[in-house]
């Protein structure tokens, strides 16, 4: 994959330092995926829309030393530049959203995952897992109260992590799946203390868009799939793509979509990220095959 000129190559050492210093942050995000009969070529597509207060996002490429894990590319986000979303050299993609239906004070007081070498769960999973199946089996990484979306060339999955580390796992090889910022499975719903209006509205909207896009035998192209993440149907604060009603309020600051072609070959990574915190016009865009020279 060619890295955009504005990208910053962040070494593993710098990422370790950032995660050790960084407190947990809430991420109001929309996650969705499509697979099999929902996709024009029968492959798999996944996406994450990242909403947060105005912040700079950085495109990074991490190539660990031999024996220390897989190479990966994606976005480091916010003040502490934690790795937030991306895809690795084996073809595993992931993103996450906070379980915002649990009060922030309580979330911050809960245990949070750090690997023995200091990595948070997104970076750890991409460094050490090659497939969705392997990522699901890496149970040690699921500690924080968050929701993960995972995808590879054969399937997509959403994992809810509840307080105490219990999980729900929903996997698809065909059809669609979506999540936002509250628990939605029967085993997890009891942990919702207060569901935000935006989370409810965005979840209903992305589910409706996915259903409409795949009804009556229809399938989605990658362009059509990406367009869902840019929907502004519900205004500045409750749309999937949020412009924000306040300059310093929550708004969409980054977007990722990944396509795994049914025929095989390299995954296609689409990224959009804000390079200047207070300037929505600073959005950078790339779309390229993910390749690593190892």
Give the location of each predicted region.
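Bacterial N-terminal signal peptides that target proteins for export
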Residues: 1-12
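Catalytic cofactor-binding cores of redox enzymes
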Residues: 141-167
């Amino acid at each position: 994959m060619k890295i955009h000129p504005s990208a910053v190559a962040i070494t593993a050492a710098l990422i370790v330092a950032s995660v050790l210093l960084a407190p947990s942050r809430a991420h109001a995000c929309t996650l969705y995926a499509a697979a099999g009969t929902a996709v024009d070529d029968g492959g798999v597509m996944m996406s994450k829309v990242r909403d947060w207060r105005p912040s700079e996002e950085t495109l990074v490429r991490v190539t660990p030393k031999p024996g220390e894990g897989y190479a990966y590319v994606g976005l480091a986000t916010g003040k502490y530049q934690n790795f937030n979303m991306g895809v690795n050299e084996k073809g595993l993609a992931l993103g996450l959203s906070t379980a915002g239906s649990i009060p922030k004070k309580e979330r911050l007081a809960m245990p949070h995952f750090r690997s023995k070498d200091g990595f948070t769960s997104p970076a750890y999973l991409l460094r050490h897992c090659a497939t969705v199946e392997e990522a699901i089996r890496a149970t040690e990484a699921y500690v924080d109260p968050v929701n993960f979306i995972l995808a590879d060339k054969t399937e997509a999955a959403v994992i809810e992590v509840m307080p105490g580390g219990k999980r729900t796992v929903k996997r698809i090889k065909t059809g669609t799946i979506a999540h936002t910022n509250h628990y939605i499975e029967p085993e997890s719903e009891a942990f919702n203390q207060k569901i935000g209006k935006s989370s409810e509205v965005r979840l209903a909207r992305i589910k409706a868009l996915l259903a409409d896009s795949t009804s009556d035998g229809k399938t989605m192209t990658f362009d059509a799939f990406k367009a869902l993440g840019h929907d502004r149907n519900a205004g500045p604060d409750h749309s999937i793509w949020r412009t924000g009603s306040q300059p310093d309020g929550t708004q969409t600051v980054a977007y990722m979509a990944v396509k795994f072609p049914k025929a095989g070959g390299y995954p296609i990574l689409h990224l959009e990220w804000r390079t200047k915190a207070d300037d929505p016009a600073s959005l950078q865009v790339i779309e390229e095959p993910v390749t690593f020279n190892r």
